[in-house]
A protein has these predicted regions:
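A short acidic, Gly/Pro-enriched loop at the edge of an enzyme's catalytic core
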Residues: 202-209
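Glycine-rich beta-strand-centered segment in the early N-terminal region that forms part
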Residues: 22-40, 52-95
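NAD(P)H dinucleotide-binding glycine-rich loop of Rossmann-like/cofactor-binding domains
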Residues: 57, 74, 90-152
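Short glycine/proline-centered loop/turn elements that form peptide/ligand docking sites
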Residues: 76-78, 174-183, 216-218, 240
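Mid-domain Rossmann-like dinucleotide-binding core that forms the NAD(H)/NADP(H) cofactor-binding site
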Residues: 124-194
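Glycine-rich phosphate-binding loop and adjacent beta-alpha segment
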Residues: 217-253
Length: 253
């Protein structure tokens, strides 16, 4: 089968090589999926640049791709949640990526059936982003009835985070470009702030949670709008000793 693989890490010129490898076999708990679509997201670029090799030291060449959509072609003996012909999607385990291929062998617990209202291409954009947001809300201990500030609500991650947060019963405040305000409010945001005309650090305070999708200087600004004991989860920032010192946090935290 054809696959797209990393053969070297390169920070400046991300290149994948198309090659042929054997079609994967499956274990008793796995599903063989014939791939119809695959998502491309920043994590794929980070892997290509070698930015996660300290966490997951991939052995090159490595087939790329984290998000997969496809049709179940065969199932393992102990798989009881799928049947041949099901349309499925999933976020592949970080240590077993490989969605940029004609087929993938996946643990059945890493997959779900695709809702009929999603096309294959639409479904391919969901797993990694949605699971990341769910993990962030779990880390916060997010509780219904409390308030969350989601930075960059007009972006792809923010656009996914808003309806998920609302489904969990949270009050959502977000910001972004004013020309997208109507779309963001239609996603369920309770309050939208146009960053060009309003400084949220002056008009928002005492929020319970912050989901930082921007990083950089915005992370520190968002710390200032939380109530004491609030929780911030950043999807972009890389905290270090200098950050801890500026924010009066212990370095081990």
């Amino acid at each position: 089968m054809k696959v797209a693989q990393h053969t070297t890490y390169n920070k400046n010129n991300i290149t994948l090589n198309i090659t042929e490898i054997a079609k994967p076999s499956i274990t008793d708990k796995q599903v063989l999926v014939k791939v119809t679509a695959a998502g491309v997201n920043p994590l794929d670029n980070m892997i290509s640049r070698g930015e996660v090799k300290m966490i997951v030291p991939y052995k090159l060449p490595q087939t790329a791709g984290n998000e997969v959509v496809g049709i179940v072609e065969s199932i393992g003996k102990k798989v009881d949640n799928f049947q041949v012909g099901n349309r499925v999607f999933g976020r592949l385990p970080l240590d077993h990526i490989g969605a940029f291929a004609e087929y993938v062998a996946v643990d059945s617990q890493a997959l779900a059936k695709v809702p009929d209202y999603l096309s294959d291409e639409e479904a391919a954009t969901v797993p990694l982003t949605a699971l990341t947001i769910m993990q962030a809300l779990d880390l916060m201990g997010a509780q219904a009835g409390k308030t969350i500030f989601i930075s960059g609500g007009t972006g792809g991650v923010g656009g996914m985070a808003i309806p998920i947060a609302k489904a969990k019963g949270l009050k959502v405040i977000t910001n972004g470009s004013g020309d997208s305000a109507e779309r963001v409010l239609n996603l369920g945001a309770d309050r939208f702030i146009d960053y060009k005309t309003e400084d949220y650090t002056k008009t928002v305070s005492e929020v319970d949670y912050v989901l930082d999708t921007l990083g950089g200087a915005e992370t520190e600004k968002q710390m200032s709008i939380m109530k004491k004991g609030g929780h911030l989860v950043s999807l972009r920032a890389m905290p270090n000793g200098a950050f801890a010192k500026r924010m009066n946090l212990p370095k081990w935290k």
